[in-house]
Amino acid sequence: MLGRPFGAPSEPHVQRRVLRHLLSLFEHPSGPVLDDFPEDAPVAGEATSFACPVSFASAKPRDGGLAGAVLEEIAELGPWYELARRRRGRTTVGVFGSTAEAAARHVLSYVKGAPEATPNPAWSPGMAVKRACDDLKAYYYEAVAAQPGNLDARAIENWFWMETAAAQAFLAIRDYCLKSNDESLKPLGKLSLIPRFVTDGK
């Protein structure tokens, strides 16, 4: 991460002051000019600790098992995801299909040991799984980023991998990929699905 050169997210007043200060540097008769901004930017989580308004009860599988827990999480995050999409005017969800639920069901079909066919015949199983996982992770990340607290990327990543049922599904599908004879799935299990800090801690 390159930090926050223009201030914290969702702080337009601070960001404007930073930009005005930057533009004022062009008024110096000679340069280059190295000047400190007179204010300290608030650190993510400094004023408000992260208390996600949606609690997943440590992501323990519920009556519907892991699949039910993932789909329940998606439903609970839905209002936050929609808020994020309206604020930004766009979303990165959609490389697999039109909804996070569709991506989740594809991922979960592998967890259950009965993989669905790829939605696009041009995609290999590995490509479909990767796209579905990317969609699912983007949905969670965008939803939680819309919640109060100004979380940084590391906090969001830790929350996803340590506290959600979706992360448990990713770990399960990684095991499937590692044991698979499909050459498009094996690299996912070895390299692409799970960050090293998660697998090293297993």
Label for each model-derived stretch:
Residues 32-99:
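Charge-patterned, long linear interaction tracts outside catalytic cores
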Residues 1-55:
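Conserved, well-structured core segments that form the ligand-binding/active-site neighborhood
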Residues 83-202:
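Extended non-globular C-terminal regions
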Residues 8-16, 60-67, 159, 163-164, ...:
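Short, structured coil/loop segments at alpha-helix boundaries
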